[in-house]
Amino acid sequence: MGLETEKADVQLFVDDDVYSRHSGVDYGDSEKFTDLGVDRDPRRLNSHLQLGFEDVIAEPVSTHSLDKVWICSHALFEISKYIIYKFLTVFLAIPLAFAAGILFATLSCLHIWITMPFVKTCLMVLPSVQTIWKSVTDVAIAPLCTSVGRSFSSVSLQLSHD
C-alpha cells in the first residue's frame, strides 16, 4: 500500500538542439522566435551556466520519489528557470548593460588617455634614469659598501669554553 514494487521506466525525449538553446521549453508560436539560430555566446563565455535538472537534482537508486513527482518537479524546474530568467532580464538587462557600458567606457578612456601615456613616458625616461642611477651607485654607494665590507672582514671571533 503506497509502496512501489515495480520500477517505472520514465524517459524524457528532447531534441538536443532545442534543449541546448531553450532549456527544454516548448514555444507555442515558432514565428515569434525565428532569430534563435543566432549564437549569442560565440566565444563560450558562459558555457558553465548550461545546467539541466539532472545537474542540480539527483536521487540515488536507494531513495526515489514517485515518478509523477519526479516528472512534475523536472517540468517545474525548467519552466521556473525559464520564466524567472526572462523576468529578471526584462528588469535588469537594460540597466546593467547601461552600467557595464559606462564602466567599460570609463576604463577604456582611463587606459587610453592616462595609463598608457604614463607607461610610455616612464619607459622613455627609464634609460636616462638608469644611467644616472648607475652613476650614483658607482660614486656613492659602491665605495660605502666596499668600506663596510672591508671593516667587517677584519673582525674575527673566537669562542672559548669556560
From Swiss-Prot:
PANTHER family: CAVEOLIN, CAVEOLIN-2. The modification Phosphotyrosine is found at residues 19, 27. May act as a scaffolding protein within caveolar membranes. Interacts directly with G-protein alpha subunits and can functionally regulate their activity. Acts as an accessory protein in conjunction with CAV1 in targeting to lipid rafts and driving caveolae formation. Positive regulator of cellular mitogenesis of the MAPK signaling pathway. Required for the insulin-stimulated nuclear translocation and activation of MAPK1 and STAT3, and the subsequent regulation of cell cycle progression. InterPro entries: Caveolin, Caveolin_CS. Monomer or homodimer. Interacts with CAV1; the interaction forms a stable heterooligomeric complex that is required for targeting to lipid rafts and for caveolae formation. Tyrosine phosphorylated forms do not form heterooligomers with the Tyr-19-phosphorylated form existing as a monomer or dimer, and the Tyr-27-form as a monomer only. Interacts (tyrosine phosphorylated form) with the SH2 domain-containing proteins, RASA1, NCK1 and SRC. Interacts (tyrosine phosphorylated form) with INSR, the interaction (Tyr-27-phosphorylated form) is increased on insulin stimulation. Residues 1-86, 108-162 are cytoplasmic. It is a peripheral membrane protein. It comes from the Eukaryota. This is Caveolin-2. Phosphorylated on serine and tyrosine residues. CAV1 promotes phosphorylation on Ser-23 which then targets the complex to the plasma membrane, lipid rafts and caveolae. Phosphorylation on both Tyr-19 and Tyr-27 is required for insulin-induced 'Ser-727' phosphorylation of STAT3 and its activation. Phosphorylation on Tyr-19 is required for insulin-induced phosphorylation of MAPK1 and DNA binding of STAT3. Tyrosine phosphorylation is induced by both EGF and insulin. One of its GO terms (biological process) is vesicle docking. Keywords: Cell membrane, Cytoplasm, Golgi apparatus, Membrane, Nucleus, Phosphoprotein. It is found in: Nucleus; Cytoplasm; Golgi apparatus membrane; Cell membrane. Residues 87-107 dip into the membrane without crossing it. Belongs to the caveolin family. GO terms for molecular function: D1 dopamine receptor binding; molecular adaptor activity; protein kinase binding. It comes from Dasypus novemcinctus. The modification Phosphoserine is found at residues 20, 23. GO terms for cellular component: caveola; cytoplasmic vesicle; focal adhesion; Golgi membrane; nucleus; perinuclear region of cytoplasm; plasma membrane raft; sarcolemma.
